[in-house]
Amino acid sequence: MKAFSCLLSVIATAASLFQHVDARSHARDKLNNISRVERPVIHTPSRRVHAHSHFDLTFDLYPRSSRIKLQLEPNHDVLSHDARVTFLDTEGNVDRTERIERRDHSVFKGWAWTQAKSGAWERVGWARIILHRDGEDPLFEGVFTVMHDHHQVIAKSKYVRKRHQQDPPLDNTPGEYMLLFRGSDIAQTQSTGNVERSIMSSPSCDADTLAYDSNSNFMFPPLPEENNTSIWNYFMTSIGKRQMTDTGGVVPGSRDLKETIGSTSGCPNTRKVALIGVVADCTYTNTFASEMDARADIISVVNAASVVYEHSFNISLTLGEINILPKNCPATASSATPFNQQCDDRAGGGSFTLADRLNTFSAWRGKKTDDFAFWTLMTDCTTENQVGLAWAAQLCVKGVQGNPDSRNSSSQAVAGANVVSKTDNTWQVFAHEAGHIFGAVHDCDSMLCQNPANPDNSRCCPATASTCDARGRFMMNPTSGSQITDFSPCSIGQICSRMARRTILTSCLTTNRGVDTISGQQCGNGIVEDGEDCDCGDEESCKGNTCCDPKTCKYTSGSQCDDANEECCKGCKFASSSTICRTSSGPCDPEEKCSGNSGDCPHDIHSKDGETCGTDLQCASGQCTSRDLQCQMHLGNQVAGSRTVAFDSYGCEVACKDPDRPNVRYEGSLTFLDGTPCGGGGTCKNGQCSGSTFGNEVSDWVSRHKPIVIGVAVGAGCLLLLAIASCICGRSRRQRPRNRKMPPINMRPMAPVYNGWNGAPPNAQQSSPGGHPPYNNIPPPINAPPPAYPGHLPSTRYA
């Protein structure tokens, strides 16, 4: 029985390892143009600023002669109050830990403006920068947008280090200065049919080398009718490498992707904060002059990436912890940090790939006990032209599934983690890979739209309900492209609907009310801190807000709350107790109403998992569902529509079947909702069956194999009956009477009278006064006549 339980555990674990999806990003193509940032001016009296300054920064773009103005303010969201940096030694042990002082990092956000010929300024986009040097000759890096075309500002030294062979060369101007390139300056890959061609290797985010990717049903047509056919086997024989992409974990059907395009239902109405952790490995740290510079670059990357999440999902990405490893890579990777090694240093030969780094880093992340949304490993290594890799739909997931084995390249560990390689547009790679962790699939491009494995354009996010190709304009584009600064309406609808359906976790997302920031109390940072009634941001952001005074962060006269930051606030007054602040999503998720004396909406409460909510339906993660219903939702289009049922009731991977073909198993990188019943009396949790017991496992196995059990029971019963019958028959035979010789009966004579005997009886001795000696129980001789006894004793016949 112990072995049986162990076997079930192994099978369940192995099955769970085919439920998630990884996504990988590839390096950009060559640059057609690059500009130098000329005449930068900080518009303050002394040309000096500090980390908490509000100021304008202007400069020219040579040779375009365009004047740009960045209107900037501190971005206090990028660092949490207790943000810290931990310095590790080469063995992975903690050397020291320091608090990240907000005043040491001049990180800013704001708006980009262009100057017309008339001299008037027009706002054309957003800006996120980090200032390295102020004064008369400032030096900064970051990104800003002009009409949705991103402009990347980088230092000359960084460009030289990461310059592609066919990028424009630089002149011999000495010293450090700033360069700029646009997304539209990147050479675009040309494609003809299914063959992609470019001067550089194809820049894409394909996810076809790890088992999680290969097991994705949403990249394949229906399976051929074979017993126990799996997506993995079908993939190995029918789909080429370049025809794949990832699916982002638990993906709604094609109808759902189209129906939710542009919908923000499910995303937070008020600002939420996602705390993240970042680790810099030795190869990444080695690209900087100091550990301080490495830390600043990480902050700059998160600062730039956060803006697209704030605009799309009302979620800020905030650094909670940074771990920095020494720049000298160890000769042999430590068991504590196996991901920290040279790019081509893998035991047993070959290269230590980006997938290897993700696996080992995920195992490391799984041991962390924090409440971070995810962790990112920053590295300077790539695999061919791949520069990013992430597990999909792992937001807020704690722990790890699986275990990487250095001797087995196919072994995987899945956690809330990703890997990002250092490039000159790292922030985009970071934002793209984080999008997969939030559960986004790729946007459709021309290749996916023409792929026969993508019927009805259901395996990617289409541009509209009637148009497939998104033309490479958005953050989840599978290949590099220009003007990528936002998520597509389809990606927004998908992520928000996943939050609403609870197919991704959001428990780690915190509110921005009562959050302590690294800088302490700062009015105007958009976070309501101790001592503040409200905080709508700077004066530009607070335009039209009549509830909050942006200068004092106090309610205006007569106001009780702030409509922009409190869900139970209407017209600066508390909403009535009959006001619904969070609607019901079904029988298992009751609506929440305002209290009438607070601006906050009560906590979201849903029915207990396992409660009955309909015929053959139970609550799971706030949804009224069943295993069959989830199969119909996720794989119905590929199997049998509304007739689709679950293949079994044991595991937590979505495995379905057509009742007319019960031996054909349809599966993919899908998991049942948390709280869905699974084998052994357990429930699904992050794709694994937890809470099962050995007794229930045995009972469940019996119920799932009734024909076998009945056959064995009948056979054993018959054998038992035969054994009992045999015993009864044997006992009956032993009790039957039989003719047999009777043993002689010796009787002690009483005063016998010997007639015809000569002398005394045989063997007799003369009596003595002391009594008689014992008799020897010897019968009389056969020929001797029997003795005569007095009385009428019956005679005994000896035979």
Swiss-Prot record:
Its EC number is 3.4.24.-. This is Disintegrin and metalloproteinase domain-containing protein B. GO terms for cellular component: membrane. Residues 753-799 are annotated as: Disordered. Glycans are attached at residues 33, 227-228, 314, 408. One of its GO terms (molecular function) is metalloendopeptidase activity. The gene is ADM-B. It is an enzyme of class 3 (hydrolase).
